[in-house]
Amino acid sequence: SELNNLKLANLTKGEFENVIKMIEYLYNNLFLTKANCKTVTFSKTLHFILPDLIVPIDRKFTQTFFELSNPQFQYGGFDVFRYFFTNFWNFTKQYNLKALLDKEWNTCETKIIDNIIIGYHLKNE
């Protein structure tokens, strides 16, 4: 696949725009769950397949961190995924996450973003 060797942090704006179109196609054509809200299942499945490109998304940490209401998250469809993905990409442009890579919890830059969100939530609950 064209997505296999891509890293979120390395994408140029043009590459990002192309990737988001490919991901939208996958979002709309992979039937991974019968639930109305596919964002969690989709992001976690794609993170497993494309760990350097996709940040895993969940309700408890990611939805809360971005302060999305349940209806926004539940019914926003691909727009919600695009919102998260765009914010994650922008974050990689602002911070050097490579410096935080290790062999334990921070195995890739997308997992570092996930860990930052979880850590923020745990510190502030």
Regions of interest found by a model, annotated:
Residues 1-37:
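Helix-hairpin-helix/helix-loop-helix acidic hairpins
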Residues 7-10, 44, 108, 114:
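Helix N-terminus capping/helix-initiation residues
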Residues 25-66:
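Catalytic DNA-binding helix-loop module of base-excision-repair DNA glycosylases/AP lyases
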Residues 57-125:
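C-terminal accessory module of base-excision DNA glycosylases/AP lyases that mediates lesion recognition
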Residues 12, 21-23, 43, 77, ...:
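A general marker of short, structured functional hotspots
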